Every structure is written in C-alpha cells, then in structure tokens.
C-alpha cells in the first residue's frame, strides 16, 4: 500500500500565528481595507441575503465588513481565525476569506475545506495575494543577496498566479468559477513604510527555510541603495506592486445554469455578430 505523503510545509505555522496575533493589535492595513471595500461591493452585486456566514479571519474584519453592508445582508456570522477552528457544519450560505489563504501550507485543501462548509448553492469568495505581489521587493532581495552574501536566500514566499487560482476552484468542485485580479502599484517615501504595511497584515517572512540569522545593517543599507536604483520614481519614491486575486464559485446545486456542450448552440457565431452590429 502506497503511503500518502503530507504536503511540504512552506510556512512556519507557529511563527505565522504569532505574527498575525501581533498584527491584530496594530492599525488596520490599507491593503485589508481595500479588500474589505471590494468584498462589500461584490456582495452588494449578489441579489440575495445570506442567512449563515462563515468568515476566515479576525473579528475586526467581521465588524468592518458588516459596517459596509445593509443590516439584512447577513443574519448570522461565525468568524474563525484559523482553518483548524472551522466548524464541521455544511450549512453556510457564504464562506469568505480575505488575504489569508496565500499563507496556507495546503492551499488546495484549505479551499476544499471552505467549500465543504457550504450548503448547496452557497457562495465562496476569497481574496489572496497573487504572484505579481511584491515583485520589486523580491528582485531587490535577489540583487542584495548576491551583493552581500554571494548567493540567494528565501525571503518572499511563492504565490499563486491567475491560472493556478482557476485550477484551485475547479479542484474544489465549485461551479461557475471566476477569477479576477486587482493589480495596483503603491509609491513609498521610504522602505520602512512598506515593511510596516506588511507587518500590519502579519505577512513578513514566515518561511520555514528563512535565513536563521538577522540581516545586518550593512545588508539593509545595500538593500535600500539597490531599491532606489532599480525601482524608484523621478521623485525618489519607491514603487511596489500588489496583485489581489479574487476567487469566486458556487457550491453545486441542480438549479444552477450548466454550460452548454460544444456544438449545442442554436445560433451561429456569424449570426450573433450580425445581430450585435445591427
């Protein structure tokens, strides 16, 4: 009998929990505020209220989201800070996760778990950082590692791209899967502000294979020089890219519209285009 191997642990779960606990005591991240506003807009576009809602995140997220929506949108909310705290119930109308899943060791399993919490025709929505996030920071780490240490060390963890995110939804068995992206660039007056924004989310380096020594003042001095040289604007501010992937899907239900089989359309593409032009 073949032994099933556990997925590799990319993240230090203990350190991640500690960082997130500290982040909960800090000011709300502007990145989380952006995700919350976008989530509220998406929920307002859904023409239904949700009786029972499961949120993967901190209680502050629950309060912020509720404040942006009509009172009748949610009847009952259960908020869990970790996957281990998720209930066994499968009767939720909505499961929602904001900027948490990118740090899960077993991302496919996490989405499957949240999908299993849904009742038929329940809605899954998640926002997580995508592969273009912190691309400038990543490249500056590469350059500085080479300059100072003569080799590369792990600093920023890998993140899913658009195609991978779509595959995760299909693998979880969600119907009508949709992935869209929110890409934006932030200009920072100094590097310390960028680091502070990441700490506000608890998203600094929690890789299990992270360097076991503290980066020196000499390293950070060279890092700042490299960042300024490689990714600064004319006014001296530092550019940093972010990408938030939005994943949406529905728990299967017989009432849902099914995609047509190839060749089953009852109108030709040419006729459709003529109709559009007329």
Annotate the PLM regions.
Residues 1-49:
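Class I SAM-dependent methyltransferase Rossmann-like catalytic core
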Residues 40, 44, 172, 189-278:
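C-terminal lobe and adjacent flexible extensions of AdoMet/dcAdoMet transferase-like proteins
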Residues 60-72:
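Conserved SAM-binding loop of SAM-dependent methyltransferases across substrates and taxa
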Residues 75-87:
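Adenosine-cofactor binding site in Rossmann-like domains, unifying the SAM/SAH pocket
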Residues 85-95:
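A short acidic, Gly/Pro-enriched loop at the edge of an enzyme's catalytic core
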Residues 98-103:
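Short catalytic micro-motifs in class I SAM-dependent methyltransferases
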Residues 108-123:
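A short glycine-rich, Lys/Arg-flanked "PGG" loop and its adjoining helix->strand segment in the class I
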Residues 127-191, 201-214:
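Conserved catalytic/acceptor-binding region of the Class I
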């Amino acid at each position: 009998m073949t032994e099933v191997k556990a997925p590799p642990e990319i993240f230090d779960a203990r350190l991640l929990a500690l960082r997130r606990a500290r982040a909960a005591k800090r000011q709300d991240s502007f990145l989380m505020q952006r995700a919350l506003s976008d989530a509220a807009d998406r929920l307002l576009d859904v023409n239904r209220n949700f009786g029972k809602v499961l949120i993967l995140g901190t209680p502050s997220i629950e309060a912020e989201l509720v404040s942006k929506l009509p009172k009748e949108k949610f009847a009952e909310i259960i908020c869990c800070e970790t996957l281990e705290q998720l209930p066994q119930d499968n009767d939720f109308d909505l499961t929602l996760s904001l900027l948490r899943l990118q740090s899960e060791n077993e991302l496919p399993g996490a989405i499957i778990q949240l999908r299993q919490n849904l009742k038929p025709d329940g809605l899954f929505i998640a926002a997580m950082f995508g592969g273009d996030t912190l691309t400038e920071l990543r490249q500056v780490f590469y350059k500085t590692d080479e300059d100072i240490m003569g080799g590369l060390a792990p600093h920023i963890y890998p993140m899913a791209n658009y195609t991978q995110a779509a595959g995760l939804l299909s693998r979880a068995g969600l119907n009508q899967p949709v992935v869209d992206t929110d890409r934006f660039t932030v200009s920072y007056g100094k590097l310390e502000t960028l680091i502070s924004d990441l700490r506000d989310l608890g998203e600094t380096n929690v890789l299990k294979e992270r360097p076991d020594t503290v980066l020196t003042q000499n390293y950070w001095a060279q890092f700042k020089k490299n960042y300024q040289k490689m990714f600064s604007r004319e006014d001296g501010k530092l550019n940093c890219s972010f990408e938030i992937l939005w994943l949406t899907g529905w728990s299967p239900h017989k009432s849902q519209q099914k995609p047509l089989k190839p060749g089953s359309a009852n109108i030709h593409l040419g006729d459709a285009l003529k109709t559009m032009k007329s």
